[in-house]
């Protein structure tokens, strides 16, 4: 190693860290075969569950109904409701179709499936189940 390389290492260690000695090798090394055998395969982090916590549908009680405005290129008032799920969690759900008669304290079935133009709305009310009626034909 030349003097210029040593001085460059000393210069970077002075500016980057508290050590006055030049760093000649990396402090973080790869695991040896013995360490990998002893520790086993690396643990994967658990999959993040959605608002239904891995279930296809959940029952919930309507707390209030309201309208939300969609994101930029779309313009409408989307009908939504705040629901207390059977897991104890509260969530905002989209009510599909035209017209609904949902009121406070009614029981609904919700399923996963976000509404693309409503930020934060990740659940959809199932029409025709419990207190939420079918969409009326014209």
Swiss-Prot record:
Signal peptide: none annotated. GO terms for cellular component: mitochondrial inner membrane; mitochondrial ribosome; mitochondrial small ribosomal subunit; mitochondrion; ribosome. It comes from the Eukaryota. It is found in: Mitochondrion. Residues 1-29 form a transit peptide. Disulfide bonds: none annotated. Keywords: Mitochondrion, Ribonucleoprotein, Ribosomal protein, Transit peptide. It holds the Pfam family Ribosom_S12_S23. The keyword Ribonucleoprotein applies. One of its GO terms (molecular function) is RNA binding. Residues 36-56 are annotated as: Disordered. GO terms for biological process: mitochondrial translation; translation. The keyword Ribonucleoprotein applies. Component of the mitochondrial small ribosomal subunit (mt-SSU). Mature mammalian 55S mitochondrial ribosomes consist of a small (28S) and a large (39S) subunit. The 28S small subunit contains a 12S ribosomal RNA (12S mt-rRNA) and 30 different proteins. The 39S large subunit contains a 16S rRNA (16S mt-rRNA), a copy of mitochondrial valine transfer RNA (mt-tRNA(Val)), which plays an integral structural role, and 52 different proteins. Belongs to the universal ribosomal protein uS12 family. This is Small ribosomal subunit protein uS12m. It comes from Homo sapiens. The lineage of its organism: Eukaryota, Metazoa, Chordata, Craniata, Vertebrata.
């Amino acid at each position: 190693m030349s003097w210029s390389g040593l001085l460059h290492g000393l210069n970077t260690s002075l500016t980057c860290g508290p050590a006055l000695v030049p760093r000649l090798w990396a402090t973080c090394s790869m695991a040896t075969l013995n360490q990998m055998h002893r520790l086993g395969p690396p643990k994967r982090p658990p999959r993040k569950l959605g608002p239904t916590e891995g279930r296809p549908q959940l029952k919930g009680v309507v707390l209030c109904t309201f309208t939300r405005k969609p994101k930029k290129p779309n313009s409408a008032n989307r009908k939504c409701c705040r629901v207390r799920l059977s897991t104890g969690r509260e969530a905002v759900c989209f009510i599909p179709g035209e017209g609904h008669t949902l009121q406070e304290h009614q029981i609904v079935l919700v399923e996963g499936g976000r509404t693309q133009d409503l930020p934060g709305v990740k659940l959809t009310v199932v029409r025709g189940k419990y207190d939420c009626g079918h969409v009326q034909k014209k």
